[in-house]
Curated annotation (Swiss-Prot):
The LRRNT domain, residue ranges: 116-153
Gene: OPTC
Function: Inhibits angiogenesis in the vitreous humor of the eye, and therefore represses neovascularization. Binds collagen fibrils. May be involved in collagen fiber organization via regulation of other members of the small leucine-rich repeat proteoglycan superfamily.
Ranges of the LRR repeats in the UniProt entry: 154-175, 178-199, 202-223, 248-269, 270-290, 300-320
Subcellular location(s) of the protein: Secreted, Extracellular space, Extracellular matrix
Site (Cleavage): 20-21, 32-33, 87-88, 114-115
Protein's recorded name: Opticin
PANTHER family: EPIPHYCAN-RELATED, OPTICIN
Amino acid sequence: MRLLAFLSLLALVLQETGTASLPRKERKRREEQMPREGDSFEVLPLRNDVLNPDNYGEVIDLSNYEELTDYGDQLPEVKVTSLAPATSISPAKSTTAPGTPSSNPTMTRPTTAGLLLSSQPNHGLPTCLVCVCLGSSVYCDDIDLEDIPPLPRRTAYLYARFNRISRIRAEDFKGLTKLKRIDLSNNLISSIDNDAFRLLHALQDLILPENQLEALPVLPSGIEFLDVRLNRLQSSGIQPAAFRAMEKLQFLYLSDNLLDSIPGPLPLSLRSVHLQNNLIETMQRDVFCDPEEHKHTRRQLEDIRLDGNPINLSLFPSAYFCLPRLPIGRFT
Ligand SMILES: *[C@@H]1O[C@H](CO)[C@@H](O)[C@H](O)[C@H]1NC(C)=O
């Protein structure tokens, strides 16, 4: 009898400790995953939930993400030691701070951006001191930039979100043939020289939402992901057949602009075209489907958004036969 009582007490105690320790373990596990203060995680592109298509997360340079977690602890040290030789450092090279093993990318905090940028115009600008350069990625978010800074030749990923850049010049990306992604979300860009992106043959993702663009420049044909949401794009600002040669284009996000027509012809590679909240009133019957070819030629294009436009989609019943799904929008 006493043994039985002891056993049930033991069971109770075990149950208690078991449940009590569970949340603690869970909490600890979460804490370990959380960035610590000073880790500079705010520069990472991983929180861009709003504009993520299915694969946007997959193409993020995860190797760099790991590097960043590795070097978090060294941040304060590097910051202090690497600021001194600012004037002599060429921005085209990856700089290595004294005391940091040479294989490490330089980590600096972008806190001195305003100072350095205003005192050192144009060449000689130590981009990797005001921005964070990690491998082939350059992070320049939210440091009051007014221009694209000179970039290291090997730059493949550029993030310069939340700045005050108003213009992109033809020479800004000249010779940066390794660039795969340019993210200039949330700037004041109202003009882009026509040649600014044209020769960037490696460019896959061009991300320009929340700017003031009325027109698009010539785009390189390798682009897979084009995001120009929340600008002032007009149909006259998009060249006729601007997207036709872009045979890798999968995501075309042009919502919340001033377009009054659907820009066509659209490449067959498209999976997603967002045109909601524009001024589209009508459409060409062949903008999606080729009336000559009675086939389901657009199996990929599953996501067409035309809601928030004055168009009555019921008026174009013959425009959708090749699509796997009807567009989203007003049908009555
Ligand atoms: C939209 O078009 C359909 C088909 O012609 C028509 O029946 C409907 O009344 C139209 N709706 C509006 C709001 O104009």
